[in-house]
């Protein structure tokens, strides 16, 4: 923890095409080595593919996918005496979104499609339908929290 003042949150401008702040934040997660234009091309390309396949608002599907991936609880390690316990804690809303975006991008990168836009579109569609690797990750995290419910009295 820093001993100085806490750094102010930077304001993230809405993305130019859809006017969505959450989509702009997602582009920052997709971006590598500061290449924002490449990240925009990937995300907009993925949303176009989603629109082609589903014939509905791609932003709606994106938000539905994020909700399906975002975890409600997670486990944190807490050392008590000589033992380390996995203590389940509730995830605050900003971290929920950050984790969902991170998992979505990570599992999209591991898919087999040809381009990143296609991988991202595939993972978005799978997540919106409640399947896919990112949704499985959320279920695993929830299962870990459920299994360690006995240690929930070791609150942070």
From Swiss-Prot:
Q: Which UniProt keywords apply?
A: Ribonucleoprotein, Ribosomal protein, RNA-binding, rRNA-binding, tRNA-binding
Q: Per its record, what are the GO molecular function terms?
A: rRNA binding; structural constituent of ribosome; tRNA binding
What cellular component terms from Gene Ontology apply here?
small ribosomal subunit
Keyword tRNA-binding present in the record's keywords: the answer is yes
Q: Which InterPro entries match?
A: Ribosomal_uS7 (IPR000235), Ribosomal_uS7_bac/org-type (IPR005717), Ribosomal_uS7_CS (IPR020606), Ribosomal_uS7_dom (IPR023798), Ribosomal_uS7_dom_sf (IPR036823)
- Give one GO biological process term: translation
Q: Which residues form the signal peptide?
A: none
What's a Pfam family this protein contains?
A: Ribosomal_S7
Q: Which CDD domains match?
A: uS7_Bacteria
Which family does the record assign? Belongs to the universal ribosomal protein uS7 family.
**What quaternary structure, including any partners, is listed in this protein's UniProt entry?**
Part of the 30S ribosomal subunit. Contacts proteins S9 and S11.
Role summary: One of the primary rRNA binding proteins, it binds directly to 16S rRNA where it nucleates assembly of the head domain of the 30S subunit. Is located at the subunit interface close to the decoding center, probably blocks exit of the E-site tRNA.
The name of this protein is Small ribosomal subunit protein uS7
- What organism, scientifically named, is this protein from? Pseudomonas fluorescens (strain ATCC BAA-477 / NRRL B-23932 / Pf-5)
């Amino acid at each position: 923890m820093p001993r100085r003042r806490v750094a102010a949150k930077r304001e993230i401008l809405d993305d130019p095409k859809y006017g969505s702040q959450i989509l702009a934040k997602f582009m920052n997660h997709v971006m590598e080595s500061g290449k924002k234009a490449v990240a925009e091309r990937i995300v907009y390309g993925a949303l176009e593919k989603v629109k082609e396949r589903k014939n509905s608002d791609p932003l709606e599907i994106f938000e539905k996918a994020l909700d399906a991936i975002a975890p409600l609880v997670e486990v944190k390690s807490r050392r008590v005496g000589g033992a380390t316990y996995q203590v389940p804690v509730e995830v605050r809303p900003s971290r929920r979104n950050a984790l969902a975006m991170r998992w979505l991008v990570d599992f999209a990168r591991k898919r087999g499609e040809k381009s990143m836009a296609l991988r991202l579109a595939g993972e978005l569609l799978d997540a919106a339908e409640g399947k896919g690797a990112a949704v499985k990750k959320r279920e695993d995290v929830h299962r870990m929290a459920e299994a360690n419910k006995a240690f929930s009295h070791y609150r942070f």
